[in-house]
Amino acid sequence: MAVYVNSTTGPPSSVVRNSAGFHPSIWGDTFIPSGNSAVQKTDVDRKEEENLQLLKQEVKKMLTAGDTCQQDLICLIDDIQRLGLSYHFEAEIDTLLQHVKDSYLEYYGTKNHDNLHDVALSFRLLRQEGHNISSDVFSKFQDSDGKFNEKLVKDVRGMLSLFEAAHLSVHGENILEDALEFTTSHLNSYLNSNPNAPLADLVRRALKYPLRKSFNRMVARHYISIYHKYYWHKQVLLDLAKCDFNLVQKVHQKELGYITRWWKDLDFTNKLPFARDRVVECYFWITGVYFEPRYAAPRKFLTKVISLTSIIDDIYDVYGTPEELVQLTDAIDKWDINILDQLPEYMRHAYKPLLDVFAEGEEEMAKEGLPTYGVDYAKEAFKRLTVTYLHEAKWLQAQYFPTFEEYMSVALVSGAVKMLSVSSFVRMGNIATREAFEWLSKDPLIVNGLSVICRLSDDIVGHEFENQRPHIPSAVECYMKSHHVTKETAYAELRKPIINAWKDMNEECLQPEAPPKPLLERVFNLARVINFLYDGHDGYTHSSTRTKDMITSVLINPIPA
């Protein structure tokens, strides 16, 4: 936020604008088609699409064959999901998992069924689908003292499956907490002793990015690259995965060309040079929320919303004066294009596009014969967001140091993911009912969990950079002061609520009154992307290294045939 500096020789006060020193966009016009080279379907693309359909039919036969044993079916489903293909076979997978659920206790609950991989994998697959399967099924792998049997250590694939299953725990499931501790320790030991073993790639990846906390495109890109190494791999699945990944990538490239052209026409680089220019990173973020081609409309809408949110965040956080920020907050509350001229000129460049994007979404939904009430919910969420932005700006102006509790009461909203959750429902079609928006507006566990994960993950990795300019204290500084502890202790303590937040999110997904899974997945996917972008550093603000590599692997480089 800009501050006033008094001068005895000049005017009564002058405005000193802050600068955060954000690096410029690293992408330039990379994704904007030049001349007549707009992404068009070629004969090669058409052949690939035909090949895709043929391969899909082969896999569908594998899923519907009546003579396949249950162990093989759950392994097949796991591979399909890891390879990013499950959206092609949703009905078949739902039917199969319902059969697994119906026979679960009879099949896996007996002491005779002691295959750890089968039990843990089926548990994870069912929990992922919202089936509240009891974790007591793992007690048969414990000794009389309640400890996991050491003989399990030799079953590396089983240990890996138990590790992944443990990340679907809810509060009070001590057996899964013990399982996580047990498997983490022994899988790390396995890696140290067998760094080049075939399973080492899977183990290494899981320890860093458990499946429950990973987003689809990154999981698929990695698994496709190593799947051929494993004795259980199926060539038809690998061929389908490569074909599908590359075709979906072309869909994303075409959309990103449209998005970057829209962004370039807004000319924020010249009109608002103090703000982060991260539209490509925003699109990448939103492909983590929904990557499937059928979600093109919500993907474009949410990308525009998050891109403009980033600009407006920087107006509050870096550039605007207290008086200007009050004006902007009031204008957003009124949501009226007729007051555009009352704003400072630089703010108009962000205010008008904001209103335009929501109006565009509303018009498109009306043309499709869909109700538009979701846009109103998203507007209200955006208004609440900017109120917290202003609250933090006032803290900075007053040089106020909030308690940790005060800070979190505001910062859980200013992290913007509550607004993004609402906005993620807007273009989802008829499944996003008024009841779903009402449920979301009451801050359910899954949204609060997401907010905690976002805010604390961001603050832990980003607070030192923010402290290089005038900025409010982060959760780290507030916790240090409130509890009289060191920075390292604060980090450790703040990671505990993040762990609990994931459990909250898992719990919400098992509630019968929760909205349909396609809606819950949007909220959960926001947390998954955050888990990647804020891993070790702020990969959104500082996107020129690891984030660049991730974007390149998902949105630029096709997978070789």
From Swiss-Prot:
Compartments (UniProt record): Cytoplasm
UniProt keyword Protease, yes or no: no
Enzyme class, broadest EC rank: lyase
Cofactors: Mn(2+); Mg(2+)
Metabolic or biological pathway, per its Swiss-Prot or TrEMBL entry: Secondary metabolite biosynthesis; terpenoid biosynthesis
CDD domains, A to Z: Terpene_cyclase_plant_C1
GO molecular function, one term: terpene synthase activity
Pfam family, one: Terpene_synth
Gene: STS2
Reactions accelerated catalytically: (2E,6E)-farnesyl diphosphate + H2O = kunzeaol + diphosphate
Name the UniProt record assigns to this protein: Sesquiterpene synthase 2
E.C. designation(s): 4.2.3.143
Keywords, alphabetical: Cytoplasm, Lyase, Magnesium, Manganese, Metal-binding
UniProt motif DDXXD motif: location: 313-317
Binding site for Mg(2+) 2: 313, 317
Residues reported in the UniProt entry to bind Mg(2+) 3: 458, 466
Family (UniProt): Belongs to the terpene synthase family. Tpsa subfamily.
GO biological process: diterpenoid biosynthetic process
